[in-house]
Curated annotation (Swiss-Prot):
Residues the record lists as binding L-glutamine: G74, P75, G76, Q106, S152, L153
UniProt-listed InterPro entries: Aldolase_TIM, Anth_synth/Amidotransfase, Anthranilate_synth_II, Class_I_gatase-like, GATASE, Indole-3-glycerol_P_synth_dom, Indole-3-GlycerolPSynthase_CS, PRAI_dom
Organism name: Aspergillus awamori (Black koji mold)
Region: Indole-3-glycerol phosphate synthase, residue numbers: 253-517
Pathway: Amino-acid biosynthesis; L-tryptophan biosynthesis; L-tryptophan from chorismate: step 1/5; Amino-acid biosynthesis; L-tryptophan biosynthesis; L-tryptophan from chorismate: step 3/5; Amino-acid biosynthesis; L-tryptophan biosynthesis; L-tryptophan from chorismate: step 4/5
SUPFAM superfamilies to which the protein is assigned, alphabetical: Class I glutamine amidotransferase-like, Ribulose-phoshate binding barrel
The protein's role, per its UniProt record: Trifunctional enzyme bearing the Gln amidotransferase (GATase) domain of anthranilate synthase, indole-glycerolphosphate synthase, and phosphoribosylanthranilate isomerase activities.
NCBIfam families: PRK00278.2-4, trpG_papA
The name this protein goes by in its record: Multifunctional tryptophan biosynthesis protein
Amino acid sequence: MADSGLVDHSPHHPTKAAQLNTASNVILIDNYDSFTWNVYLVLEGATVNVFRNDQITLEELIAKKPTQLVISPGPGHPETDAGISSAAIQYFSGKIPIFGVCMGQQCIITCFGGKVDVTGEILHGKTSALKHDGKGAYEGLPDSLALTRYHSLAGTHATIPDCLEVSSSVQLTDDSNKDVIMGVRHKKLAVEGVQFHPESILTEYGRTMFRNFLKLTAGTWEGNGKHFDEQSNTTKATVSSNTAPKTDKKLSILERIYDHRRAAVAVQKTIPSQRPADLQAAYDLNLAPPQVPFPARLRQSPYPLSLMAEIKRASPSKGMIAENACAPAQARQYAKAGASVISVLTEPEWFKGSIDDLRAVRQSLEGLTNRPAILRKEFVFDEYQILEARLAGADTVLLIVKMLSVELLTRLYHYSRSLGMEPLVEVNTPEEMKIAVDLGAEVIGVNNRDLTSFEVDLGTTSRLMDQVPSSTIVCALSGISGPKDVEAYKKEGVKAILVGEALMRAADTAAFIAELLGGSSQNVSKESRSSPLVKICGTRSEEAARAAIEAGADLIGIIMVQGRTRCVPDDVALRISQVVKSIPKPAGQTPPTSRGTPAAASVEYFDHSARILRHPSRALLVGVFQNQPLDYILSQQQKLGLDVVQLHGSEPLEWAKLIPVPVIRKFGLDEPAIARRAYHSLPLLDSGVGGTGELLDQSRVQNVLDKDSGLRVILAGGLDPTNVAGIVQKLGESGRKVVGVDVSSGVESDGAQDLGKIRAFVQAVRGL
């Protein structure tokens, strides 16, 4: 038989090595193609446990406390067919040694940000000559050796991230002098992969490669006594010039953050309820909160430049800034001070933020007349993070050009836009700016901080302005702390600035923002003091309605609750409705036109609601209901032409969104949700069922009002012409939050409405 030239390198009569105590619990993730791997590992003294990639969870894997992790070959693509493999690599990187073969190596490449693609040739069971760097798995091996390949995919040179180095390669068989990546290695972490099959009978020194790996015990090369930043004495050959590893350097803080986030996101994606499919299902159910267009909102500002106000508890460069900051409370301050965008850092380790911060910020801005857009400030590298941001209420996300390949950046950019979010694309150099402009980004942020050295140069933004089309919004990011920092930006066409640390430390947020942007604190909405709305409730006749309106009452209440003494039948209610809608407010009672509130300003929800309830030309008719069916309430509203509905029982809070007119809702002093925005137009503080003449405890009223600076209420309970002014005045500064007063029994005599008392009550309130 003719000699084929093939050499069988398998161990024909293998001798099992002594038990390795350091490899006492090797976990092999089987990607449905592991063949006899466990046998080869056992031959080198390892104790091996094998698990299919879809038959163990990451939590179960962690609980088994492996000493080393091996990822096997397998069919398909690493991003779709490797099961738990990638999540395991992300979690265990830096903790224990990891070795990947074929698809296992491809998982390593994609986990750290690289890409795999077709090699241009399909080799299954073919041998090639390997060139390697003599380190890691190749330590002590000859310069060139034969290996066996079973693959059509491999890592691509252009996408290998800085944290990885190419450790071996083979030349293509097409005489192109191009090579294919056969091995990669993390520069700091004990993570290594090979594209070929060491266990094949046609691969030389396969057992030695396994042995070299099983000697490793620590999660870093340094921990294993390996210093790959210096040329190894055992290196017998170098990888070809096309695959030469990039110059090693100290892992930058940005790379460390990215590596950590990749690991965390990989784990999160395996948790039931947080998996990509779970998020997509929630999005498909239209559960993402309403959004505002990011570029359009950036163009709206009460100041010469738009402000992107950042919520940041800490940073790698400054350490702890505001550990105890309440993100939603901070967001409301920023919004009321005129911010166009609120940036929420959601990275937990270095910046001490979370996606829950963003969710709470979005909820806190509900009901503002022109709420700021919300930016998820995060190290984004996966569509999953963008979808997560949208579901939490983000209007835009940050994409950092420095950390993304052009291919990945483009993919993430268009995915974000598909969710209705124009991203903020961050750059720092002319090269990165060109990428952002070519991408077609509508909003580009120039980071004045070098993310490698963390040095700040405020001139960075200025130097890049001439590369940007006039239609593009340019934002200056980082290092801005005072008015002098932004003066040049105004002249150069910069449209917005992002400020974080200085804002978090400011004693008076509104004053600092006004001074910073060269405006005035008057540029943002300032509510002028008006006397409270007057609501005359329990109206039972046309005469009483007419007297109340002519005295200057704003709201005429009629009781629609069957069985109550003040309940009016529909025919009487219709006649009262006609009176309310036909009699104008008396001269001098028409409120002045609102002045000094720029269109870009965000008005607090309850302030806006109070304006709506103060009709410019007539009183409004309020129908009072208590624990009655929603259908009945809606029917009566249409039949009687009610301008406002008052819910005085235990109706669901959500009904306010189902009723087509403003809703006043009664609350007791101990009831929750009194200050919940975007449901009831105004809360009404009252005792019991109302109409009893029982005064509320003044100190408890004060406590309720002091809990929320944006709360506005209608005050009821025992008020009459003789005490209403004094009760409101005793509340001091908190009395400004009483935007309406409600009276029923306080304007009655012997159970009937007293027209004189009605007039006296209105007059007393107008004097406040």
